[in-house]
Amino acid sequence: MNDFSAWAEIDLDAVAHNVAALKALTRPACRLMAAVKADGYGHGMCEVASVALESGASALGVSRIDEALDLRNHGITAPILVLGHTPAHRCREMVDQNLIQTVCALAEAQALSRAATAIGATVSVHLKVDTGMGRLGINTVVPGRTAPQEAAVKEALAVLDLPGLAAEGVFTHFACADSADKTHANAQFKRFSTLIQELEAAGRPVAVRHAANSAALIDMPETHLDMVRAGIAIYGLYPSAEVDRQKVALKPAMAFKTRVAQVKKVPAGFTVSYGATYTTPKPTVLAVVSVGYADGLNRLLSSRGFMLVRGCRVPLVGRICMDLTMLDVGGVPDVAVGDEVVIFGSQNGAFIGADEIADALNTISYEVVTSITGRVPRVYCNGSSSAVRR
């Protein structure tokens, strides 16, 4: 037993299972990129990256160049695509560390081209096109049309012709692939496919075409192309309740846990926590547990959420504090200081998922797992071995 106040258990065997299961949904020639940005969605970027690469992934996706450099510093040599913007003055790092940089506009690509030619180098890039996400990328959208606007094709061709850049890939990102209604996703894919055809017709084919995120990987096999980008699904969480979960069995990789710090009997009419917003309706037993909003437990769960104690669901009562939270354990016998408490995960056959917490907060599981803060140790389990990252 560890002595942590709160900790996240990461099942690396579950990550391995998920990556292999997702790769099995694709054609053999289709590569899988594991998205490990945001510290591996809170699970640990380097730890997840290593397991993903051993389990069927052949490339990694990060948001920022410093994440890519961290992976390189940990000895990871696989292709890494930086999905976000990087200032052109960091060109030397891109080249020296063999990174692939996303470019999203002609002006951005021109700046990177000038920086690369100034040092006599070539930077590998993937061109991103916006087909309906409204975020990064060359805008291809003409409202009411599924064909890309002509200016977008010209801009893309201009990027591909720049010196100092090796345009290895072109990609887009779906806004609604996790919806049961695929109308918007289909329109995006049509724009993307047409743009690719026009690039090819102009004599500028691109080797690596990718569009599918986790949701499209599961639900839209026609979008798999040369590579898929798996994010939330490699961590065992489905992109939404609307994707077809029958197509792949995922295993949640993270459990978030804490311990009982104090147990106290209280009478009816007893007020709990800041603001005295909760009053006990009858005599009961409170357990004070060593987790709070500084650990990533959202304060909006105050008097709304549940945790598991001895395999029983018990309610959070009163406002969540920075470091502590109170539970009503009056219905659970023999609760004691030091008992394990599960915020999400399994205990004695009971389960609370990150999705359940997300639903209570009117958000998504992505936010739940990435919100767990750096002061929470990650405890890694892989087969019979375990390791801790503080």
From Swiss-Prot:
Keywords: Isomerase, Pyridoxal phosphate. The keyword Mitochondrion does not apply. The modification N6-(pyridoxal phosphate)lysine is found at residue 37. NCBIfam families: alr. Pathway: Amino-acid biosynthesis; D-alanine biosynthesis; D-alanine from L-alanine: step 1/1. Catalyzes the interconversion of L-alanine and D-alanine. May also act on other amino acids. The active site is at 37 (proton acceptor), 274 (proton acceptor). The keyword Isomerase applies. Its cofactor is pyridoxal 5'-phosphate. It comes from the Bacteria. Substrate binds at residues 135, 322. GO terms for biological process: D-alanine biosynthetic process; peptidoglycan biosynthetic process. This is Alanine racemase. It catalyses: L-alanine = D-alanine. It comes from Desulfosudis oleivorans (strain DSM 6200 / JCM 39069 / Hxd3) (Desulfococcus oleovorans). One of its GO terms (molecular function) is alanine racemase activity. Coiled coil: none annotated. Belongs to the alanine racemase family. Its EC number is 5.1.1.1. GO terms for cellular component: cytosol. InterPro entries: Ala_racemase (IPR000821), Ala_racemase/Decarboxylase_C (IPR009006), Ala_racemase_C (IPR011079), Ala_racemase_N (IPR001608), Ala_racemase_pyridoxalP-BS (IPR020622), PLP-binding_barrel (IPR029066).
